[in-house]
């Protein structure tokens, strides 16, 4: 039976009604600081925690509940006579319910206006300690860490008592919360180091919060959820949906890739970029002198595959572009913004998901789940550090610009990957092949014609160069590093093709 509850909450939503309910059930309430004042002002009978501990708050509120009279009251095992005799001797009254939510560290750590020292003050100490004590004692103590659980506990109390299963569930939510909270603090502290060189943390603790339950995963028989980082900003975290159906698992994955491609280009330099994605694979990408031209050129890359795909822009979509977009079936259009006229046009397609991104891509690490483990690597952000022309013929300035465009696109295609480029259009994309010549032939056949070619990895044989010669490719960019590099260089010289080595591979599995 619940006789005494301790309430200490930062978020006051719903607590007044719940406290009134507890009072109606003759539950004595103990509270701290701001919560005590809030309940008192609203005529809720409440005891200040200092009356229980016999000690006033100290160190600017850093120490309030870190006291044996609080934790002894929570941790005492009710069916252990020794425990109960001990707390009785010390004048400690058991606490049967703990209601705590934490300082808003998740929110404050992302606030660029706060200094490091100011963020430190939002690290909660007493709150997690009380929650963990109560969760450990879940058989005897009901612990609530989520405002959404007030109604659950209330309904069970009205029927008699909170069930063992519910108490265990609430305890599991506590450890889920405190582990995420500590992970966020650890990540914040580690990322604030002046140098991380030769420094590694022994555990990978990443803090993600449930954003929404998805209808299903990659396929209808797979359950799925979407979680977002509690510490990092990111384009897939704070976007705004302006129209259309709810997003699916596949939508979010494809949208992420589509946006990353266009954000390789700088709108401020009038690099108006557009990309099209289907099944996590680029089927078109282009630059244009306007948003409309960028889209039309992307569509021209592969008018068949773009159907039912995701289209992304690094700039604002205008009315003229919107009128072209609605001519075909698309799942998503994501852009920096939309003019009011463009949005009105796009909304004529009620199921078309229209997404406005607010943050540029911010990924620093890449995670791959394997059975029983997690592979962690740096995100592939390096393009060209120091390229080298290895052939007799050198690329023209325009060819070089197209080659760099190609590298920015090919890194997002599944390996083995080849992209054939003409006038800043990815006219042919060969990807996901188990050998490079197949990827090359696929890209060349799709392109029909092209000027330059980009490869995500080196050529093991000269066959790729020979195939390029048949399609009149003028220049090639690739990492180099094969034992047979010289054979490919010789082939380029024979065919009058320029070739550049970047020294940077872009495998994508």
From Swiss-Prot:
Q: Which family does it belong to?
A: Belongs to the PurH family.
An example GO CC term for this entry is:
cytosol
- MGS-like domain sequence ranges: 1-145
Q: What is this protein called?
A: Bifunctional purine biosynthesis protein PurH
Recorded catalytic reaction(s): these are: (6R)-10-formyltetrahydrofolate + 5-amino-1-(5-phospho-beta-D-ribosyl)imidazole-4-carboxamide = 5-formamido-1-(5-phospho-D-ribosyl)imidazole-4-carboxamide + (6S)-5,6,7,8-tetrahydrofolate; IMP + H2O = 5-formamido-1-(5-phospho-D-ribosyl)imidazole-4-carboxamide
Top-level taxon in the UniProt lineage:
Bacteria
* A Pfam short name: MGS
Which biological pathway? Purine metabolism; IMP biosynthesis via de novo pathway; 5-formamido-1-(5-phospho-D-ribosyl)imidazole-4-carboxamide from 5-amino-1-(5-phospho-D-ribosyl)imidazole-4-carboxamide (10-formyl THF route): step 1/1; Purine metabolism; IMP biosynthesis via de novo pathway; IMP from 5-formamido-1-(5-phospho-D-ribosyl)imidazole-4-carboxamide: step 1/1
Keyword NAD in annotation = no
The residues forming a coiled coil are none
Domain remarks: The IMP cyclohydrolase activity resides in the N-terminal region.
What GO biological process terms are annotated to this protein in UniProt? 'de novo' IMP biosynthetic process
The keyword Transport appears for this protein? no
Source organism per UniProt: Brachyspira hyodysenteriae (strain ATCC 49526 / WA1)
Enzyme Commission (EC) number: 2.1.2.3, 3.5.4.10
Give the keywords, sorted. Answer: Hydrolase, Multifunctional enzyme, Purine biosynthesis, Transferase
A GO molecular-function term, please? phosphoribosylaminoimidazolecarboxamide formyltransferase activity
- InterPro entries xrefs: AICAR_Tfase_dup_dom_sf, Cytidine_deaminase-like, MGS-like_dom, MGS-like_dom_sf, PurH-like
Return the SUPFAM superfamilies for the record: Cytidine deaminase-like (SSF53927), Methylglyoxal synthase-like (SSF52335)
């Amino acid at each position: 039976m619940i006789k005494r509850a301790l309430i200490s909450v930062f978020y006051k939503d719903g607590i007044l009604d719940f406290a009134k309910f507890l009072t109606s059930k003759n539950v004595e309430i103990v509270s701290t600081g701001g919560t005590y004042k809030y309940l008192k002002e609203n005529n809720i009978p409440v005891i200040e925690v200092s009356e229980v501990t016999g000690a006033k708050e100290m160190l600017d509120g850093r120490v309030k509940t870190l006291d044996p009279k609080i934790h002894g009251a929570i941790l005492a095992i009710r069916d252990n006579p020794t425990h109960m005799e001990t707390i009785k001797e010390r004048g400690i009254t058991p606490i049967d319910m703990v209601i705590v939510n934490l300082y808003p560290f998740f929110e404050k750590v992302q606030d660029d206006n706060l200094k490091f020292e100011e963020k430190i003050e939002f690290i909660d100490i007493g709150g997690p300690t009380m929650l963990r004590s109560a969760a450990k004692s879940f058989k005897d103590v009901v612990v609530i860490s989520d405002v959404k659980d007030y109604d659950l506990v209330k309904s069970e109390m009205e029927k008699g008592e909170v069930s063992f299963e519910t108490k265990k569930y609430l305890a599991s939510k506590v450890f889920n919360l405190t582990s995420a909270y500590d992970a966020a603090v650890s990540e914040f502290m580690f990322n604030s180091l002046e140098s991380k060189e030769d420094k590694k943390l022994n555990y990978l603790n990443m803090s993600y919060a449930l954003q929404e339950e998805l209808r299903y995963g990659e396929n209808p028989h797979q359950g799925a959820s979407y979680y977002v980082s509690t510490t990092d900003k990111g384009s897939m975290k704070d976007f705004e949906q302006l129209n259309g159906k709810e997003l699916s698992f596949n939508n979010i994955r494809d949208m992420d890739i589509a946006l990353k491609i266009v954000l390789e280009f700088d709108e401020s330099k009038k690099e108006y970029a557009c990309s099209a994605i289907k099944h996590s694979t680029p089927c078109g990408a282009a630059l244009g002198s306007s948003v409309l031209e960028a889209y039309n050129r992307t569509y021209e890359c592969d008018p068949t595959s773009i159907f039912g795909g995701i289209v992304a822009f690094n700039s604002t979509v205008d009315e003229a572009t919107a009128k072209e977009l609605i001519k075909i079936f698309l799942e998503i259009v994501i852009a920096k913004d939309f003019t009011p006229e463009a949005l009105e046009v796009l909304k004529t397609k009620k199921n078309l998901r229209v997404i406005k991104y607010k943050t540029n891509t911010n990924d620093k690490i890449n995670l791959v789940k394997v059975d029983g483990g997690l592979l962690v690597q740096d995100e592939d952000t390096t393009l060209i550090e120091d390229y080298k022309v290895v052939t007799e013929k050198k690329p023209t300035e325009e060819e070089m610009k197209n080659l760099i465009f190609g590298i920015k696109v090919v890194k997002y295609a599944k390996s083995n990957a080849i992209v054939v480029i003409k006038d800043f259009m990815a006219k042919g994309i060969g990807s996901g092949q188990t050998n490079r010549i197949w990827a090359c032939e696929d890209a060349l056949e799709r392109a029909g014609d092209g000027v330059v070619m980009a490869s995500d990895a080196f050529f093991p044989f000269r066959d790729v160069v020979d195939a390029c010669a048949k399609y009149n490719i003028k220049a090639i960019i690739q990492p180099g590093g094969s034992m047979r590099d010289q054979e490919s260089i010789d082939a380029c010289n024979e065919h009058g093709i320029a070739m550049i080595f970047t020294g940077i591979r872009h495998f994508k599995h």
